[in-house]
Amino acid sequence: MTVPEPRASAPESTAPVWSEEPTPVCPEDLSEGTWELLRAEAKRAMARAYVPYSNYPVGAAGLVDDGRIVGGCNIENASFGVTLCAECSLVSELFMTGGGRLVAFDCVDGEGKTLVPCGRCRQLLLEHGGNDLVINMPSGRAPMSVVLPEAFGPDHLAGTPSEHEAKH
């Protein structure tokens, strides 16, 4: 079985968003070039949004700790409660392409303007990026610990993930 090529960096491109093997990254390593790649992927994803009801497309992009960039778009449904935010699509792609931890995140609307994740999506991003995940917001970049202070997370549940896995 062959592994699919990495996702494109822009709607008109089929080239991967990186040219070399992915290398581990941390929040301190984020350059303006990295943020530009995230913005390009978010815009590419936004162009694929399914929004027949609101006509409000959203695209999201995240940098994974191994150097991959994953993206997602919002997908509406006539039963509004089952509409998927772009962040949900992004986390699905994260797991479909090998998992990992999110290091940086960007989100745009149909005009390419920066959006802040809703509360539900902040919680979702916290689960897969932790307090150090850097979020791009209209007011600037901030770690998740600032964007979602004193958040409920896995540490609040009984047992650690490794203890939970050992029980099953």
What do the PLM-derived regions correspond to, one by one?
Residues 2-48, 97-168:
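C-terminal binding/interaction regions
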Residues 41-44, 86-94:
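Short, well-ordered amphipathic alpha-helical segments that serve as non-catalytic structural scaffolds
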Residues 50-53:
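Short Gly/Pro-enriched turn/cap motifs at secondary-structure boundaries
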Residues 55-64:
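Short beta-strand scaffold segments in enzyme catalytic cores
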Residues 63-65, 74-75:
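Histidine- and/or cysteine-centered catalytic micro-motif in compact active-site loops
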Residues 73-88:
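Compact, glycine-rich, soluble single-domain proteins
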